[in-house]
Amino acid sequence: MNALTRMLVCVVTAIFSAALFAQSPPAPAAIDQFARLQGELRRTHESGDAAAYLATAQSMYSFLNGSPSAALQLMSAESFAGKADEALHRFSQFVAMGQANEEALKAKSFDPLRGLPRFKSIDADMAANHTSKSAAAVVFQLQSTARIPEDIDYDAETRHFYISTVLGKQILQVDMAGHTRLFASAPDQWPMMALKVDSRNRVLWATEVALDGFAAAAKADWGRSAVLQYDLGSGKLLHRIEGPPKAALGDMALAANGDPIVSDGEHGGVYRINGDTQSIVRLDAGDFVSPQTPAVLADGRHILVPDYVRGLALLDLNTKQVDWIPTEGMHALSGIDGLYALATTLIATQNGTSPERVVRFVLTEPKTRVLSESIIERATPTLGDPTHGVVVGEYFYYIANSGWDVLDEHGNLLEGKSLPVSSVMRAKVI
């Protein structure tokens, strides 16, 4: 997971910079294309070339599969080119996707639209996207030792949750009442990120990541990741597997046989770890910019990969073919951090949308289109910056108010801010 960049604009900047960093390995095709388009957008806008700026914004819109951020960018270019009707259509799409961003709309490029009656009407509709909605309740609040809780999973045999902490650099074991004990500390003292419980084999898989530029990790280690296997009963570290160079293995799912599938939100790779040999195999062909938590499908051949920037993709594990699920101008599919599949239902934690939200999508079968969506939680005092979740029985449990939004890009507290009290929320999803 690109853990420092919750808002999509920040992700764009961070990944563009990473693609140009001299010590980075050759960029995968998607990151390279993204960097080129981002640079071209800046160049054409600064030069005042309205036609070239519009053409590039259209290319970016296509590349990002009609994401909300790309819609706003294209709206800006259409307004700049004097195409008010097209710009207002794009604005209506942005709002139809449940988005609201008053700050972005203060940009000078939108000045020609503000006095138009249709703009005012759409702007009024946008305000409704800020209204609070919730079908969730607080299960327990996390203790202060859970400093930036990141991932969560559950062991049905012991009825315990396991929660990774970024600044705490720990995995915590928590019961349904919120009673907490230390399960394991990061062996390299890097932030603990992804985790998954393999209840059948009685092991827990996790990752620790020395995020680039992150003060909580030694500078000499920046850009390194490790996949860790623990004995679930004792907390003993069984294996430590060094990740690929310059990879941030921040998100994880388990294949049917228990093999971890991990994603690198910094450089675009999706990998499978062989649980027996500890070998690492790349699963994708470079189509992703910032892949997050994959969802393994029942057929064993496909996984759904949420790209924080490009949206939601179906990846064929045999051929590496990627098919993007269309937004159809109605569904925000970018900005997903955690993704969880239940037959044709997807549960997503979206901390890269505006506003942030937890949402349920219903897909067709096969999974090629979104049929409907419904909000689980949005714009509430309890939600804050949500990260990941886990389905337990009929309920979805998820981390809310994680605290990422009060940290700067180096993982230090923003001036005047303090870490919030994080919670585990619960909503019925079946």
Where are the model-predicted features located?
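A short beta-strand motif characteristic of beta-propeller blades
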Residues: A136-Q143, H179-S185, K236-E242, Q278-A285, ...
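Short, conserved, GDST-rich strand-edge loop motifs in beta-rich repeat architectures
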Residues: T207-G223, N401-V421
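TPR/TPR-like alpha-solenoid helical repeat scaffolds
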Residues: A100-M126
